[in-house]
């Protein structure tokens, strides 16, 4: 006797009347129970997005073939198991984002399997190994950016992760590296993009006398800090904050934004279309 499975069906297609009925009727035909369903129409682009969480006994090939015959030309659909995903985390020396992810993964705040943490410095090895997670060093010294990214990419690929998380990984990635993991690399940026791109963002913010500081979690593409935005948040500051005060406050925002973004990504709620995301 087959046990029930739970899977997530994600659909992107040109908008037409009756799409929800077509998709749900096919699920009914396959005797699948719809646990949750969310949809959105982007009227500007004429695109329909739908996330459907299903439970039942699946014949993936037949289900997808039936969907293909019912959906308009140019449709994208994917069916993946619901639940726990695998990630590899990349780090340099800063511990706040990594530590938050390790704690949440260990105590149930994130339903994730951290396959490994890989760094270009040894600084965070002790922290990682306290959680019985492998730490791997891929030293960048003496290597070109391309050579180092090749070694780093090979180390990541050995773990076959669903996503790669940059937890304050302070290296600019080559286009070749990004191309190996399309729409799978998630970065936390230390400002409310597009403001204060580059180094020393909190010092830039202090010099400008800003009244809010924030953080942005986004997918990585070939343009530095310009990939599709997943999550953002800000906190209010005032003239009494030094650059160091802003940095401390900013670290709290960074770790919260990264974990919230990762929560949505792991649940397969984030759709990438162009340089935007839709979260269902």
Residue ranges with predicted function:
Residues 11-19, 57-58, 91:
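Short, surface-exposed ligand-recognition loops at beta-strand->loop->(often short) alpha-helix junctions
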Residues 40-280:
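One-carbon transfer enzymes
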Residues 2-14:
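Short glycine-/aliphatic-rich beta-strand segments at the starts of folded cytosolic domains
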Residues 16-36:
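Short amphipathic alpha-helix segments
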């Amino acid at each position: 006797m087959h046990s029930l499975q739970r899977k997530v069906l994600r659909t992107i297609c040109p908008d037409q009347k009756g799409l929800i009925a077509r998709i749900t009727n096919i699920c009914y035909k396959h005797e699948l129970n719809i646990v949750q369903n969310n949809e959105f129409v982007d009227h500007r682009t004429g695109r329909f997005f739908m996330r459907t969480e299903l439970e039942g006994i699946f014949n993936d090939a037949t289900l997808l073939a039936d969907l293909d015959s019912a959906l308009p030309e140019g449709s994208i659909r994917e069916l993946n198991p619901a639940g726990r995903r695998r990630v590899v985390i990349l780090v340099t020396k800063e511990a706040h984002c990594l530590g938050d992810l390790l704690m949440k993964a260990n105590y149930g705040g994130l339903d994730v399997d951290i396959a490994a943490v890989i760094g270009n410095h040894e600084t965070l090895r002790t922290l990682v190994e306290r959680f019985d997670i492998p730490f791997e060093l891929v030293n960048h010294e003496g290597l070109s950016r391309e050579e180092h990214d090749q070694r780093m990419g090979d180390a990541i690929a050995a773990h076959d992760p669903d996503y790669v998380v940059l937890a304050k990984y302070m290296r600019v990635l080559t286009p070749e590296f990004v191309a190996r993991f399309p729409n799978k690399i998630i970065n936390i940026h230390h400002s409310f993009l597009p403001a204060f791109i580059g180094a020393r963002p909190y010092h830039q913010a202090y010099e400008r006398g800003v009244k809010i500081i924030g953080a942005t979690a986004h997918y990585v593409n070939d343009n530095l800090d310009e990939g599709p935005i997943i999550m953002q948040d800000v906190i209010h500051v005032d003239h009494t904050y030094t650059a160091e005060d802003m940095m401390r406050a900013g670290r709290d925002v960074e770790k919260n934004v990264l974990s919230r973004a990762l929560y949505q990504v792991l649940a397969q709620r984030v759709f990438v279309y162009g340089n935007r995301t839709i979260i269902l």
